[in-house]
Design a protein with these regions (language model features):
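Active-site Gly/Thr loop motif
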Residues: 213-231
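Terminal low-complexity tails and localization/encapsulation signals of metabolic enzymes
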Residues: 1-9, 235-237, 274, 308, ...
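Conserved Rossmann-fold dehydrogenase catalytic segment
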Residues: 152-161, 183-199, 221-224
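Aromatic-enriched alpha-helical interface/lid elements that frame and gate functional surfaces
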Residues: 230-313, 317
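Glycine-rich beta-alpha junction loops
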Residues: 40, 121-124, 195-200, 238-240, ...
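N-terminal helix-loop segment corresponding to the beta1-alpha1 unit
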Residues: 1-184, 304, 308, 373, ...
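Oxidoreductase and adenylate-handling cofactor-binding alpha/beta cores
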Residues: 140, 168-188, 205-212, 256-268
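Mid-domain beta-loop-alpha active-site segment that forms a flexible
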Residues: 159-176, 195-205, 247, 251
């Protein structure tokens, strides 16, 4: 963890992916992020996959470096404590609905310069999740083999909840923008970030929306080919699949040389009356002929030999790996400074943990911090932020309004 945000405290009341991601990124830059959950855990506390000890690996990784407070959020007193924590701290990240007890108006009534950041489904208040937003975005119907029939082929969903992670990152940025504004003007802000707007807005920002409207039709499916440029997966003689991309003149020249295709490319150019060195357009328009030529050349090489040739020519390429292979690849994990030693994870399972994605040369990134046990910091936070005595906290524990650490609670997967 860096300490760039060490003077910032944020209350997080959230679940699933986008909202915890926003808090995680702030925490990895040094912010004190206090996640408040119901005493039995939030909706994501038992998110699959669970270890034999009943601990969620998803929850454990999305909540690293945070503090945990457990309140009875179904009771009036528990909700009041949560509101008081948010107002006292001044910053809130949540995905609870605006009509909930954490409505911005209620918080602003207690603190005029309150900043609340709320992740929503759709801009009109309808519920949504990454998977349903993705369905509406158009992307699943761009994916799939190019020979699929456009009228009958199924959509292809992506495994990665990309809209959740993009939304979480955008929310961390929006929170810091609101803080910067408050620092200059003294004004708080209500910030709403609909997941659906992130998806359709990304479609627009990428130029894809303008493209569809200009065409008056949908983009064709391309299989694993790169849209608008030269790139696709190929297979070596020994059966290794790898991806190549050539978007610059240097990348294109290097790829042609590495594959030994100078003469073949020259012959194809003469046949078609084009120059592939002129840019993306001729390479993309004649991709089928180029793909056949490159695959024929790949059939003559084992992957190790071809990879050495591509590396020598400065090509952009990578071998396909399974996720398990990626997790065990030294270049990606063990020898990568992004990862640090396993902290004391609540699950008891030791595995590499990430530092901040942003690397600040000259600054100590520190070792990754563990996720908390549920309620691990309840007592400390209530005492520090709200000034409650140990006796008052004890009475709240006895009443079931708050809960302390579940470290020694028996859980079943």
């Amino acid at each position: 963890m860096y300490n760039l945000l060490s003077d910032l405290s944020i209350i997080e009341v959230s679940s699933f992916v986008a909202s915890p991601t926003a808090g995680l990124y702030c925490a990895q830059m040094g912010a004190e992020v206090i996640r408040v959950d119901h005493t039995a855990g939030g909706l994501d506390y038992n998110r699959y996959l669970l270890t034999r000890e009943g601990r969620s690996l998803s929850w454990e990784n999305l909540n690293r470096a945070k503090k945990s407070v457990a309140l009875d959020l179904q009771s009036g007193e528990g909700r009041e404590l949560c509101v008081e924590l948010a107002a006292t701290t001044g910053q809130l990240i949540t995905n609870l609905p605006e009509q909930s007890f954490l409505a911005h108006a209620a918080l602003q009534a207690r603190r005029a310069d309150m900043i609340s950041l709320r992740i929503m489904g759709w801009h009109d208040g309808r519920q949504a999740m990454d998977f349903t937003v993705n369905a509406a975005s158009g992307y699943p119907l761009m994916c799939g083999p190019e020979d699929w029939d456009a009228q009958t082929a199924p959509p292809v969903n992506q495994v990665l909840p990309a809209w959740d992670f993009i939304t979480g990152a955008y929310c961390a940025f929006a929170m810091l923008a609101a803080l910067h504004h408050r620092g200059r003007t003294g004004e708080g802000n209500e910030v709403r970030v609909p997941l659906g707007d992130v998806a359709i807005g990304t479609l627009a920002n990428s130029g894809a929306m303008a493209e569809m409207l200009y065409r008056g039709a949908d983009r064709e499916r391309l299989g694993n080919a790169i849209w608008g440029a030269f790139g696709r997966d190929f297979r070596s003689r020994d059966g290794v699949r790898f991806m190549v991309a050539a978007l610059t003149p240097k990348q294109w020249r290097g790829l042609v040389t590495a594959f030994g295709l100078q003469q073949g490319i020259a012959a194809l150019e003469a046949e078609l009356g084009v120059r592939f060195a002129d840019g993306d357009t001729p390479r993309f328009q004649h991709r089928a002929a180029l793909f056949a030529l490159f695959q024929q050349a790949a059939d003559g090489f084992d992957y190790a030999a071809l990879a050495a040739r591509m590396a020598a020519e400065g090509c952009t390429f990578e071998r396909y790996r399974t996720a398990y292979e990626a997790a065990n690849d030294p270049a990606l994990v063990a020898d990568n400074p992004l990862f640090g030693p396993a902290p004391a994870n609540p699950s008891g399972f030791d595995y590499p943990a990430t530092r901040s994605f942003a690397n600040l040369p000259g600054r100590d990134a520190g070792d990754p911090a563990p996720a908390p046990f549920l309620g691990e910091h309840t007592e400390d936070v209530l005492a520090e932020k709200l000034g409650l005595s140990s006796g008052a906290i004890g009475r709240l524990v006895d009443a079931g309004t708050v809960a302390l650490s579940d470290q020694h609670t028996t859980r079943s997967p």
